[in-house]
Structure formats: C-alpha cells, structure tokens
Amino acid sequence: MMKEPTYSLHENHAMSIPVAQSGKTRIGWIGTGVMGRWMCQHAMSKGFTATVYNRSADKLQPLLDLGAKAATSPKGVAEQSDIVFAIVGFPSDVRHVFLGADGALAGSKPGTVLVDMTTSEPSLAKEIYEAAKAKGVASLDAPVSGGDVGAKNAALSIMIGGDKDVVAAVQPVFEAMGKTIIHQGGAGAGQHTKMVNQILISSNMIAVCEGLLYGYKAGLDLETVFKSVSVGAAGSKALEVLGPRMLARNFEPGFYVEHFIKDMGIALAEAEKMNLSLPGLGLAKQLYEAVRAQGYGRKGTHALLMALETLNGIKR
C-alpha cells in the first residue's frame, strides 16, 4: 500500500500534516457570505466534507442543503475539522473567529491547519501564526482576488503566506476554489501581496469610473465606447468585469465598498510603517469614504460611479 504523503508542521517539529484528500480530510468553513459560500461549495464538490458556521445562520442553508453540518461557533467548527478556513469582514472579526475564547484555535487539536482567506492585517496573520504554532497548530494567510465572479467560477487568485510544507498539504483544497495559487513567503506575505492587489485596484477603479462618466457627458453611446476601449491599452479586469455592470446600473456587490475602505486603510497603515508615501491610494480612500457617506457602503466597489455623478450634479 502506498504511504500517504505528509508534510512536517514546522521546522524542528516532529508532527506532520497529511496532504488533504477528497473523501477523507474534513474541512471547516467560517463565513459563508458573497465569497465564502461558493468557495466552500466548490471544496465540497470535490469530495471534502464540511462543517460550517456563519454569524447569520440563514446564509448556511445552501451549504446545508448540499450536506454540510452546522456548528454553533468557530470553536465548534475546529473541533470537527482537519483544516479550518475563514473569510469574514474585518480584522476584528478575524481576531474573534481565530483567537477568541470561542474561536477556532481554542477548538483545534495539534496538527489542525487554520487558513484565513480574509483580506486582513499582515501583523495579525503573524500573530495568529505564532499563537497557533504554540499549540502545535499550523496557520496560513491566504487572501483572494477575483470577487464574486471568481468565487462562483472557482477562478480565484490565492496569495498565500506561511510555511511551504503546510501550503503543500492544503493545496488540493485550494485547487478546488482557485486557478492561480501562489506561495508568497512566510506568515503575513499573503496579506502584503493582497495589499499590492488592492492598491492597484484603487486607482484603476477611479480611472474606469471617470472614463465612463466622461463618455456619458460627451454624449457617446457607452456600450459602443466599451467595445473599443475594453480591448485596447486601457483594458483591465475592473473594466472587463465591472464595466458592464455600471452600464446596466447594477451596483450590487461582488465586493463591498465598506470592505474596500478597510483594505485601503490597512495598506495606508502598512505604508506608513515603511515610511512610504502613496498619494493615489490616499485619494482613492477619500473618494470611497464619500461613497460610503452617500449610503453605498454595502454596494459594490463600482458604486464609486454614483458618487462621482453626485459630485458632478449628474442625475441618472
């Protein structure tokens, strides 16, 4: 019989982690909202049994209908799982679901793997890593990019920080939900990479919204304009995915404005620690704070268009 592949938990540690196997490895999932529901569903579709928890229990139902089991706390999830994933809203939520008295670490046995897929603070990722290591538990920070479309299509980009051997052990589950899976370095490196991603998006979103607004004001047919500019040098993922939604006046979230503001705040704080000036990011955050002030905090990031319309006295 072929021996099951394993990876050591940490250097100088005797414990090993089996590579995740369909039908054998039990996963836990904390946070089943716009992104998490689909990510967990894809893992289940590959044969991984799941125990799930969400603060709003009604959002669990699609996964329960597919055979997942519900837990009443993050701790309860970990008690029934070999690998625990979480994708929640804010760093305070991350701290609660992993390090709280009723958090996943409290329910983890030695050899469990904790995977935070929330966009959060690099320093918190390192804190979770150290707290987990002290209990013989592994930890990865693995934020994602691709929004709701990427989550639904199992096409996410997953940026991972943590020990290389642990990444290899979790790889089969990552492959169920993403297409681009890259280990960026030690604990916190995944979160730092996601900050790069969000900085790139921030100024690009301003450009997309301002470009379409200019076309509208010039009296152009925006559908026709889109066909030309989306395939040229100005083309971008933001324009490709969110441009049609803006043209259709569909501002429902693939990614919430309020979460994007959180991400930009983290990036600016990290930049300050590095004595790095990022004026474009600062401007983007101010504009998105105006979007939130106008009542669009729970809309998608492309709702920036509506705030710019208001700024220019345009009513549509």
Model-assigned labels for residue ranges:
Residues 3, 7-86, 112, 117-118, ...:
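NAD(P)+-binding Rossmann beta1-loop-alpha1 motif at the extreme N-terminus of oxidoreductases
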Residues 13-18, 289, 293-316:
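NAD(P)-dependent dehydrogenase/reductase Rossmann-like domain
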Residues 50, 70, 139-140, 181, ...:
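Hydrophobic beta-strand scaffold residues
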Residues 74-86, 90-137:
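Rossmann-fold NAD(P) dinucleotide-binding segment
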Residues 119-202:
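Rossmann-fold dinucleotide-binding core
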Residues 154, 158-161, 175, 182, ...:
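Active-site-proximal catalytic alpha-helix in oxidoreductases
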Residues 187, 191, 235-302:
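Interdomain hinge/lid region at the active-site interface
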